[in-house]
UniProtKB/Swiss-Prot annotation:
Gene Ontology molecular function terms on file: ligase activity
Organism: Bacillus cereus (strain Q1)
Record protein name field: Putative cysteine ligase BshC
Enzyme class: ligase
Lineage of origin: Bacteria, Bacillati, Bacillota, Bacilli, Bacillales
Coiled coil spans: 460-485
């Protein structure tokens, strides 16, 4: 594996944050400097965490996932007042979801290791599985290449019900068939059987989406020391009750903090991305197997436009009786994370970084400071055949990242032709139509009754010219079919569906191609935190 860094243009909050723009950095409580991390450690030392209860839960949960010894030791280390976490989170995508989930975890592991060495304190890696998510459409699919097209392959569970990812039971038989269909689209390699066994072993131990995700991730990172947490685990929810109560008692201040911070963001020229009603309480409650967002209505806490209604006392009572019914929204999830874990740093993708910039005053309302927010490592893998295609087309490795691949294809094709086709046909059409317009005037003068037919005649001639143009272009493309297929392969591999590779393709393809130790070998590479994109040649 060879690693190379390239600069890929970013936009908005992420670009300005990485470029060190003071205005947007003022929306975060810590800059990404070593001094800021030292200050963060000092700030965390002044806070209290329910470490023993948390460790007891994490030991039980990670042991059930058959965690390695390094993970167990890291969990136990959290009992120590001078142990901190680097944390990130993601939904429980089937087969772990898009590659960026793996890249987030690699980011967490690397930053935890680096900060432990540089700060001289114990830092452990934590990955937060968003088990409360009810949006199965976000996690129930993967993308494959089939018949030279990119296809979205959806897992259709035979027993679908509106439940969270932590509670949605998987039909193992259906899931096995779905996995088989996916692997049929991959080339069979020396690793295929091992990878399928690896996946099936995790599936066989799982009842829910979160179980399957947790077992797969734990097996993939078995020796890394990674700690997993299911954000919707009933035992964790019990530990969170005091903070849920605090949010309910301060929901107006939370909403005001969000509104004020979004005004700051607007003044800086950015568009806020968090959308909430002014009466939002920022907590979901599970009612009749549905996740209902609570809102304030004249002192009552209501859901679904008043279909459900609770007094403050009733809500608090329900939190104490059934904490597993409650979960956070996009605004309060980061706050709950801050309450539960002694967070040295949070690692997020571009979207997360943008919405965290809207939360500073929300954190302050609760009496917290935002942890350092570190953009995750971004990676693209280039296989040998794709590197060969790039070389054959005389393209740089950075070209598909800096330019639209379709545009690169068009430019290449136009360079193979002496005269530009589009311009020549535009000229020809103009000349022919000019002559025909003159002819139409002549016909109209002699026989006005033929005016309509003359107009149709012009349309037919135009159609024939366009047909000729299409046939010429088709023949040229056929002549250069080999090269144009290289562009298609590059597009599919590096910019599938016009998106970054890590947002579309799944890690299982790479495990199948390169073996079960693929992720371990990627983790051995040195990644930088300078905002550049990492290209790994395989």
């Amino acid at each position: 594996m060879e690693i190379k860094e390239i600069s890929v243009p970013q936009q908005g909050v992420v670009a300005d944050y990485m470029n060190g723009e003071k205005e947007i950095q003022s929306c975060f409580d810590y800059m990404l400097t070593e001094d800021a991390f030292k200050q963060r450690v000092q700030d965390l030392r002044e806070r209290e965490f329910f470490r023993q209860d948390l460790v007891a839960h994490l030991l039980e949960y990670n042991t059930k996932l058959q965690a390695g010894e390094a993970t167990i030791q890291n969990v136990k280390a959290l009992e120590d007042e001078d142990t901190y976490v680097v944390i990130a989170g993601q939904q429980a995508g089937l087969l772990t979801g898009p590659l960026y989930t793996i890249h987030k975890i690699i980011s967490v592991l690397q930053l935890a290791k680096e900060k432990e060495e540089s700060l001289g304190v114990k830092v452990v890696p934590v990955f937060w599985i968003a088990g409360e998510d009810h949006d199965m459409d976000e996690i129930n699919h993967t993308f494959v290449t089939k018949n030279k097209k990119i296809k979205k392959t959806i897992f259709h569970d035979r027993n679908p019900k509106k439940a969270s990812a932590s509670e949605s039971e998987l039909s193992l038989e259906d899931c096995r068939k779905w996995i088989e269909e996916i692997f049929k689209t991959y080339p069979e390699t020396n690793f295929t059987k091992d990878v399928l066994r690896f996946i099936d072993d995790s599936l066989g131990k799982s009842n829910t989406y979160v179980d399957f995700f947790g077992h797969l991730i734990m097996k993939m990172f078995i020796n890394s020391g990674l700690i997993l947490v299911d954000s919707h685990h009933p035992e964790l929810r019990k530990l969170e009750v005091p903070f849920f109560k605090q949010i309910v008692s301060k929901y107006k201040e939370v909403q005001e903090g969000l509104h004020n911070q979004q005004e700051v963001i607007k003044e800086l020229g950015y568009k806020p991305i968090i959308e909430t009603k002014s009466n939002a309480v920022h907590i979901f409650m599970e009612i009749d197997n549905e996740r209902v967002l609570l809102e304030d209505n004249q002192g009552k806490f209501v859901g679904k436009d008043g279909t459900y209604s609770f007094s403050y006392e009733e809500l608090i009572e329900e939190m104490e009786r059934s904490p597993e019914r409650f979960s956070n929204n996009v605004v309060t999830r980061p706050l709950m994370q801050e309450y539960v874990f002694p967070t040295l740093a949070f690692i997020g993708g571009p979207g997360e970084l943008a919405y965290w910039s809207e939360l500073q005053q929300v954190f302050h309302t609760i009496g917290f400071r935002m942890p350092p927010v570190v953009p995750r490592i971004t990676i693209t893998y280039i296989e040998r055949d794709i590197a060969t295609d790039l070389h054959d087309l005389q393209l740089q490795e950075s070209d598909p990242f800096l330019n639209n691949v379709d545009k690169l294809r068009e430019n290449w094709l136009s360079n193979q032709i002496e005269e530009p086709i589009d311009e020549r046909f535009v000229e020809a059409k103009k000349e022919i139509i000019d002559i025909h317009k003159s002819l139409q005037q002549f016909v109209k003068k002699i026989d006005p009754g033929l005016s309509s037919f003359a107009g149709k005649n012009e349309f037919k001639i135009n159609e024939q010219i366009e047909l000729l143009e299409r046939m010429l272009k088709r023949n040229i493309e056929k002549k250069h079919e080999v090269e144009l297929n290289k562009f298609r392969r590059i597009q599919f591999a590096i910019r599938p569906l016009g998106a970054p590779q890590e947002r579309v393709w799944n890690v299982c393809y790479y495990l199948n191609q390169f073996g079960l130790d693929f992720v371990d070998r990627v983790m051995e590479k040195p990644f930088s935190w300078n905002g550049k994109h990492h290209v790994i040649k395989l």
